[in-house]
């Protein structure tokens, strides 16, 4: 029974780590130094 509980916690920790990692990377890309390379397609479009 102990093995199943340990596997569950390991899976939960892995999923939380991946979620926080992707969220952190997204925030870094949106607001960090790489954000200077992003372009706004609505600003580029001329009517």
UniProtKB/Swiss-Prot annotation:
Say yes or no: keyword Membrane present.
yes
Q: Where in the cell is it found?
A: Cellular thylakoid membrane
Q: State any GO CC term.
A: plasma membrane-derived thylakoid membrane
Q: What InterPro entries does the record point to?
A: PSII_PsbN (IPR003398)
How the protein sits in the membrane?
Single-pass membrane protein
Which sequence ranges are marked TM in the entry? 9-31
Task: Tell me where on the tree of life, at the top rank, the source sits.
Answer: Bacteria
Q: Which GO terms describe its biological process?
A: photosynthesis
- Alphabetical keyword list: Membrane, Thylakoid, Transmembrane, Transmembrane helix
Principal subcellular localization: membrane
UniProt cross-references to PANTHER family, sorted A to Z? PROTEIN PSBN
Similarity-based family: Belongs to the PsbN family.
Q: What does this protein do?
A: May play a role in photosystem I and II biogenesis.
Q: What is this protein called?
A: Protein PsbN
Q: Which organism is it from?
A: Prochlorococcus marinus (strain MIT 9303)
């Amino acid at each position: 029974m102990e093995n199943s509980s340990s596997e569950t916690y390991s899976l939960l920790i892995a999923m939380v780590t991946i979620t926080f990692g992707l969220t952190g990377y997204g925030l870094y890309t949106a607001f960090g130094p790489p954000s200077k390379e992003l372009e706004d397609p609505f600003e580029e479009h001329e009517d």
